[in-house]
Structure formats: C-alpha cells, structure tokens
C-alpha cells in the first residue's frame, strides 16, 4: 500500500528556536506563509488602545468618520453582498475547538494550536494531512473525489501572533462600542459586552466605516478577523479560562470549497440541482457511505473519522459524471456538485496510522458504524424535513435505534462492531435508485 507523499522541509529561517517541518507542497506553503504581514513583529501598540481613544477620540470624532464616504468593503461580513476581498488578505471564516480558519484567495488556511504539555510529538498530530493523503493514494476510482486532501501542512510553527491580533481587535471594538454607546472607557474589556454589541452593529455601514478607519492602524496586519469575530471571542476567552496554549502549532492549507454541506438549505437546494432538501441529504449520505465502503475494501485496519457531520463535509464543483462500483452495483452522479469528507483531526486507521487524539475521544475500538450512528443523529437535527420522508427516516433509524446499543449524546457504545456489509446493503436499496445505473435493487 502507498503511504502519503510527504516532503519534509526543516525550516529554521522562519523561527529563531524550535524545529519546523513542512509536509506536502513546500512552494505553496511558503507562498501562504510569506503573505502573512509582519508575523514576527505583530505586537500590542506601544500606546494602550484605551488611552488613545480616551484622550483623542470622542463621539463627535466617530460621527465625522461615519459621515465620510470612505468605507473598505473587506470589513463587511463575508455573507454580506457588499463584501469585497482584497488580494492576499486573510479573512476569518470560522473558529472551532481545534482550529482557526481563514480564506486567502483560492486557499483555506487553518491554524491549530498544539499544546506541548499533552506530550504529543509534532509528527503525532499530522492526521489531517497524512490520513486523507494515504486514503487518496490507495483508492483507485472516482471515490477519491470524495476526499479533501490538504495541499501542505506546516508543523510546529510559532503562531502566537493570532492571539495578539485577537487582543488588539478586542481592545479596538471595546473602545469603539463604549464611545458609540456613551459608556465610560475602561482599561479592561468585557468580552460579554463586546459580544453583545458586535451582534448589534456588525451589519451596520457605520460600524464598517469605523473599522475601516481604525483596524489598519490598531491591528496593522492583512489578517482580517472581523468576519464572525464572535467565534474568536468564544475560542480565546474560553481557552484563557482553561489556561489555553497559544504559542506553537500547525498551519494547514486546503483548496477553497464552494461551501460546507450544511450551507445547502431548504432555501437554496434548487441552485445546486436538487428537487428537494431531502433529495440532497440522500445524495450527501450516499456519497459519504460509498466512500466508506470503498475505504473498507482496502486491506487495512478499521478507518474511523470520529466527527462525521455536515460541517465536516465540503462541497466542490463536479464537472463530469462520477462513477462508483460496489460489487455488481454501479452508481452514477451527474449533479453539478460533489460531497467531500474533510477535517481528519481525530481520524485514524488502526495499526497503520494511529492517532493519540482518537484514543482520548473513544475508549475502545470502533469502526464505520460509530461514525454513521453520529452522522444519522446530526442529519435529523440539521434537516428536520427528513422526518416527512418515511423511507429515509426508517433507513437512518437503523443507525440510531437498536436494543443492543446504548446511545449517549449521539456517541455509541458498541458491544460488537457491525460489518461493512450492513452499509453495502443500505446503499443498494430503492431509496437510492436515482443514482443506481442499470442494476436490480430487488435484494432490498
């Protein structure tokens, strides 16, 4: 079996201390990394932000800026029609428990803080690169199109500049909101107050005009965190309370997708070529199920993702038909999009590519059924319209209801691991006949 194409590049020119390594395309990684403005010099302003605003900025000052015509459209929220990106700026997309994600031109860049106190060696936290690349290299058919492979991964880089950018932006917003609301400026910010006022003003032209004026001065970076800034507040404030680690970590570069799977909704499914939102969820379920079936045809130990949900399935354009063969069954997808599995942070292939993070997430051996149990629960939650389709509801309930299994918070405690033949039988049923080409489904 083939192992991932890994091109290691020990880079000490990026850091004064600590070894760094680049996996994958070093040229594209360096392009991204070198476009982060002043990463080694980003620091809190010499003059404290609250003091500058207290001494020099009044409500009348802000009012004059608001009445001015100048506005930088890159500070609107990304979903706003008025948003317009500047070349080679980084725009915050989202932040979760295990990564801060930005968009930069045709790339998605994910920063992951790795806590050295957890005793992980740098190469033990590379599953987001190694596992999808391993699977892609060993799968031989169109099922490879259902996997997102990282372009490159930088390991053990110093990324604490993100925390400084956060604090600068938080201090800026705190000062602006206090003046706008007629409240006294304070040396210490209240993140709860900033969250409340950010929700109030983020769509406002006046707010964007003020950010256009002050963000370049206070933050002085091409990393724009204004979009979904509330996610960053939740991440850094929660992590600060738990003594979070914000020094070194990994930088992972992915191709830019159209969107994540949950962004296709009852309001827009027709734009993607579907007759209903339920048909789309069947399409998503079938493509991911076929990927798992083809993975389990490989002569390797159990693959488990451990976080299978629409958030971690990305949508890409599909410019030609996709053909998948399982036994005597032929599946054909002619839709203009395809679903691709992403975010392999907790994934593992037992004994071949183990993952210490997976060990902390589950306490016993699991397989594909664990993922689809959780996936089915989430589909019901995200798409309640499924309940109107009795056949699809019944099918998904086969993963969520069983007297022999104990379901706790969508997580499955399994006494016996079901065979992949169970899933093969599921995808051969008439409910998926739209995508089955010329084969009998009478063995339902």
UniProtKB/Swiss-Prot annotation:
Query: Which reaction equation describes what this protein catalyses?
Result: L-seryl-[protein] + ATP = O-phospho-L-seryl-[protein] + ADP + H(+); L-threonyl-[protein] + ATP = O-phospho-L-threonyl-[protein] + ADP + H(+)
The enzyme's first-digit EC class, named in words, is transferase
Name the principal localization, coarsely classed. host cell
Q: Which residues form the Protein kinase domain?
A: 87-444
Q: Give its E.C. classification number.
A: 2.7.11.1
GO CC list: host cell endoplasmic reticulum; host cell endoplasmic reticulum-Golgi intermediate compartment
Q: Does the keyword Nucleotide-binding apply?
A: yes
**Which residues of this protein are catalytic?**
307
Record's subcellular location: Host endoplasmic reticulum; Host endoplasmic reticulum-Golgi intermediate compartment
Modification after translation (UniProt): Phosphorylated in vivo. Autophosphorylated in vitro.
Q: Which GO terms describe its molecular function?
A: ATP binding; protein serine kinase activity; protein serine/threonine kinase activity
Q: Which PROSITE patterns match?
A: PROTEIN_KINASE_DOM, PROTEIN_KINASE_ST
Statement: the UniProt record of this protein carries the keyword Kinase: yes
Q: Which domain of life is it from?
A: Viruses
- The residues listed in the UniProt record as binding ATP, with positions renumbered to this chain, are 93-101, 118
Function in brief: Essential serine-protein kinase involved in the early stage of virion morphogenesis.
Protein family membership: Belongs to the protein kinase superfamily. Ser/Thr protein kinase family. Poxviruses subfamily.
The protein in question is named: Serine/threonine-protein kinase 2
Q: Which species is this record about?
A: Fowlpox virus (strain NVSL) (FPV)
Which gene specifies this protein's sequence? OPG054
């Amino acid at each position: 079996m083939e192992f991932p194409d890994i091109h290691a590049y020990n880079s000490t020119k990026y850091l004064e201390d600590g070894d760094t390594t680049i996996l994958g395309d070093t040229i594209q990684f360096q392009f991204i990394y070198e476009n982060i403005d002043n990463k080694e010099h980003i620091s809190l302003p010499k003059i404290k932000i609250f003091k500058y605003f207290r001494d020099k900025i009044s409500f009348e000052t802000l009012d004059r800026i608001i009445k001015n015509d100048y506005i930088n459209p890159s500070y609107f929220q990304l979903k706003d029609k008025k948003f317009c990106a500047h070349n080679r700026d980084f725009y915050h997309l989202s932040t979760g428990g295990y990564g801060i994600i930005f968009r930069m031109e045709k790339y998605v860049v994910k920063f992951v803080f790795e806590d050295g106190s957890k005793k992980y060696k740098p190469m033990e936290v590379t599953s987001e690169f190694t596992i999808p690349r391993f699977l892609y290299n060993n799968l031989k058919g169109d099922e490879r199109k259902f996997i997102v492979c990282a372009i490159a991964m930088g390991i053990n880089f110093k990324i604490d500049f993100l925390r400084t950018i956060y604090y600068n932006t938080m201090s800026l917003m705190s000062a602006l909101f206090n003046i706008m609301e007629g409240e006294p400026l304070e040396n210490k910010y209240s993140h709860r107050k900033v969250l409340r006022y950010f929700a109030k003003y983020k769509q406002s032209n006046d707010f964007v005009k003020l950010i256009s004026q002050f963000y370049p001065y206070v933050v002085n970076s091409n990393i724009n965190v204004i979009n979904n800034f509330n996610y960053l507040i939740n991440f850094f404030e929660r992590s600060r309370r738990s003594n979070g680690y914000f020094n070194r970590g990994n930088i992972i570069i992915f191709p830019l997708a159209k969107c994540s799977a949950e962004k296709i909704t009852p309001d827009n499914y027709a734009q993607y070529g579907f007759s209903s939102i339920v048909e789309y969820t069947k399409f998503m379920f079938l493509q991911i199920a076929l990927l798992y079936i083809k993975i389990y045809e490989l002569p390797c130990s159990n693959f488990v993702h451990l976080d299978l949900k629409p958030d971690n399935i990305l949508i890409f354009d599909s410019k030609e038909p996709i053909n998948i063969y399982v036994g005597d069954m032929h599946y054909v997808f002619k839709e203009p999009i395809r679903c691709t599995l992403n975010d392999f942070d907790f994934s593992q292939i037992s004994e071949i590519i183990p993952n210490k993070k997976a060990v902390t997430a589950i306490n016993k051996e699991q397989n594909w059924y664990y993922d689809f149990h959780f996936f089915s629960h989430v589909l019901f939650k995200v798409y309640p319209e499924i309940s109107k389709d009795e056949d699809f509801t019944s099918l998904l309930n086969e993963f969520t209801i069983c007297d022999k299994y104990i379901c706790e918070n969508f997580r499955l405690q399994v006494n016996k691991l079901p065979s992949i033949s169970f899933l093969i039988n599921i995808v051969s049923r008439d409910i998926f006949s739209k995508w089955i080409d010329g084969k009998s489904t009478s063995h339902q």
